[in-house]
Amino acid sequence: MFLLVAGATCYFGGNGFGADVMRPLGLRDVRVGGEIGRRIEVTITNNLLVLDADRDFLPPFKAKSADTGYIGLGKLIDATVKFAAYSGDPRVDALRRHLVAETIQAQEADGYIGLLAAPHRVRGMWDVHEMGYLIFALLTDYQYFGEERSLAAARRAADYLVQRWPTLPADWCVGTDVAPHVAATGLERTMLALNRQTGDGAYLDFTLKTRQLPEWALPIVVGRRQGIEGHVYAYTARCLAQLELHRMQPNPRLLRQTERALDFMLQHDGLHITGGTGQCEIWTDDQDGRGDLGETCATAYQLRVYDSLLRLNGDARMGDLIERTLFNALFAAQSPDGRRLRYFGPTEGPRAYWPTDTYCCPCNYRRIVAELPAMVFYRTAAGLAVNLYTPAEAKLAVGKDVALRVRQETDYPNTGRVRLLLDPARPVKFPLQLRIPRWARGATVTVNGKPAAGTVKAGAFFAVTREWKPGDEVTLDLPMTWRLVKGRQRQAGRVALMRGPQVFCLNPAQNPVLAKLDGTELGYLAIDPASLGTPVPSDVVRPGGLACKVSFWKPGFGLGNKADYELTLTEFPDPDGKATYFRLRDFSVAAEDELLAGRDR
């Protein structure tokens, strides 16, 4: 192990070198239900398949007349390819083929794929960013569907960038008003993927020598400054590229930027209770919950970094972070019906939808939702690990290539009961690992109705190793108690209500007596913990979802025994939620955020 700085917490275990301890299943090998599956479905049917790519995405790439600009076509194609692979839906596949064909047709003879006129190419604002994701998407199309023309087009575009790069002036990005790593967000990961796919060392050399990915060591820059160096999305995207390079060329130095980001989020107030980070797309540590909080692009890349670290070392906290983030920050970035998407997800005050289907956040939302099926189950060296609890089915090989089908049955996060039904082709011995969230103290595991051997520890994976036979059943019970989680910095002295991985919020529209109050005014209400009872049904966020009936006192000096209001709190993705933190009469019942346990300060 290593530490980033003296006194910092280390988030990497003993597998600093070598192969991953977990590997994701293929998108075609998993089927997901529950709220995760519903979000996948509505993103496909109510968003992807109803947007107008021929009007909003493709024309600028045919015209090539702009001097600056960004669309997000590469991100759209990448999401469409993955949705097509996962769903097998012929409508999605037709869209994939159309987008890819139109993009390749728009490619110029020299390899350029973009929307800028010749004098502005590469050096123009976001041109490298756009091209990098187009190359990545075409490569994704080849990887999932074997389209040779997509691979050829990706290579031509990458070669164009590699060849043009030496012609750029040293200060080329100054005119873009952003730092060099921000202007080229995503490029290094694209080049590494091309190198792995083709074996062409030119792409690796470009990443190592020209882009100098191993040397990147930018500190956390708090606040929006010239060059926006503290851009969370750009920062985490480059962290992800370093992690992937570490898999190819193991070096502890390549872990340090990710360590730095985790240290800031978990130890120094960079992470909000919903899993979102940063104001105005930039690292911040004051826990301001209003306005432009938690850019969706950053949320998507945080999830990818957590997934990468989970695979690298099997740290259950990364699974906890994935779960917290997707049920709150991520799903709050989408309307419940799937059609509208957000750039930001504040915990206080009004939330706004992005007005178009283009640009980075809507497209990165689609991409990360398309990747969620691969975050449910993971292969381990000897068996299977379950990371996310949701109705799901998977097929894989365990032991010496023994075919296994596994099915999850659960209404999680409504309750904490999860049934796993295992159906191996023949009896086979392997470890089944279950992630036990940090909040789930007192969790129990039974196998065929009998308690599993060993201690079930919150915040770790619990392994059941035995010879599994067709029809074996594992039942996991996670205690789902209410938690009043302490706020920090600007939220100090107040608490947020949580149950399992979910954060709950106050929507004035659901509580007419408060309809005219702003999020700040709502935050002055004091919650009565004694009034917390069994959750009640609510379809505001999802069919079969939950809400909480709870009593509150008005602001004031008295705070008598009888509460002033009985209000309904809804799940955080409620589109009209305006308050998340509330006052508390007796702070002794408040709890620390379990994800931040072990904070240095």
Q: Which role does the model predict for each range below?
A:
Residues 43, 258, 319-328, 333-421, ...:
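C-terminal beta-rich recognition modules with glycine/proline-rich loops and embedded aromatic residues
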Residues 105, 162-163, 212, 216, ...:
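Amphipathic alpha-helical segments of tetratricopeptide repeats
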Residues 440-465, 484-490:
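Solvent-exposed beta-strand/loop surfaces of large extracellular or lumenal domains
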Residues 430-433, 464-479:
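C-terminal beta-strand-rich structural cap/linker in extracellular carbohydrate-active enzymes
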Residues 16-90, 94, 121-145, 181-202, ...:
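Aromatic (Trp/Tyr) and acidic
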Residues 1-11:
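Bacterial N-terminal signal peptides
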Residues 118-128, 135, 151-182:
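Asp-box/WD-like beta-propeller blade repeats and closely related beta-sheet repeat scaffolds
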Residues 91-107:
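Aromatic-lined substrate-binding rim segments of carbohydrate-active enzymes
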